[in-house]
Regions:
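A structural signal for small-residue-enriched, beta-sheet-centric alpha/beta enzyme cores
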Residues: 72-73, 102-189
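Extended, charged alpha/beta regions that create polyanion-binding interfaces
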Residues: 1-26
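Solvent-exposed alpha-helices and their adjacent loops that cap or buttress functional pockets
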Residues: 19-22, 61-65, 92-95, 111-112, ...
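Glycine-rich phosphate/diphosphate-binding loop of Rossmann-like nucleotide-binding domains
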Residues: 33-67, 71
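Structural motif
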Residues: 25-27, 99-101
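Conserved active-site and cofactor/substrate-binding residues in soluble primary-metabolism enzymes
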Residues: 4, 8, 40, 44, ...
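A structural-propensity feature for long, helix-poor, extended segments
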Residues: 62-92, 96
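Gly/Ser/Thr-rich loops at beta-strand to alpha-helix junctions
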Residues: 30-40, 78, 105-109
Length: 189
């Protein structure tokens, strides 16, 4: 099942990226807070990613045909004092990336989607928007290159689950086995 899911995800990503190959460098950006398990999909995803930019540059003949992939985990505003968008702009410029793949945890609107789907889009994303912590948008308009968003819903607002919680938008829940699910989803992405 895992191999089929990974192949399906790779195929969908290929259709969303406007180009491929060594002449089309990509920056993979893991967004979120590494210190919060439900928000830590990205470090696990980046750990499983084959970063090739340094190899393509150092040994161009041996790595001909490889896409140049760089990775960045910019952290959160509270830890860095910088908006994720600012860090990504600098990285896109420094690496000459032609596209960004932004990986983030999301808030589910339905319990059926919680840790059960991978959402893809070509319009970018707004970090933190699912939990009411709106940051600056990460999209083609703000970065100057296409942005493919890869998101996994890992939390759900308690207000969506039942009576007595409708007015509380500050309480978010995760599955009991969130550690295992985040590890699996990070590896899949």
């Amino acid at each position: 099942f895992f191999r089929r899911a990974a192949a399906c995800l790779a195929g969908e990503l290929r259709t969303l990226l406007p180009g491929r190959g060594e002449a089309y460098p990509v920056l993979a950006a893991g967004l979120g807070n590494r210190g919060m398990t439900a928000d830590a999909v990205w470090p696990l995803a980046l750990e499983s990613l084959l970063v090739t930019r340094h190899m393509v540059r150092a040994l161009p003949r041996q790595f001909a045909g490889f896409t140049s992939v760089a990775a960045l985990a910019p952290g959160v505003l509270a830890a860095t004092g910088m908006e994720t968008l600012e860090l990504l702009r600098g990285a896109v410029q420094a690496t000459g990336s032609a596209a960004v793949i932004a990986i983030d945890a999301l808030a589910a609107r339905s319990r059926d989607r919680l840790c059960a789907t991978v959402q893809l889009g070509d319009t970018g994303l707004i970090p933190g928007s699912g939990v009411g912590n709106h940051r600056k948008a990460i999209n083609a308009e703000t970065l100057g290159v296409p942005v493919v968003a890869v998101g996994v819903p890992t939390v759900i607002a308690a207000s969506l689950l039942g009576e007595g919680t409708e007015d509380d938008d500050s309480l978010f829940l995760t599955p009991r086995d969130i550690d295992e699910k985040v590890r699996e989803l990070g590896r899949l992405i």
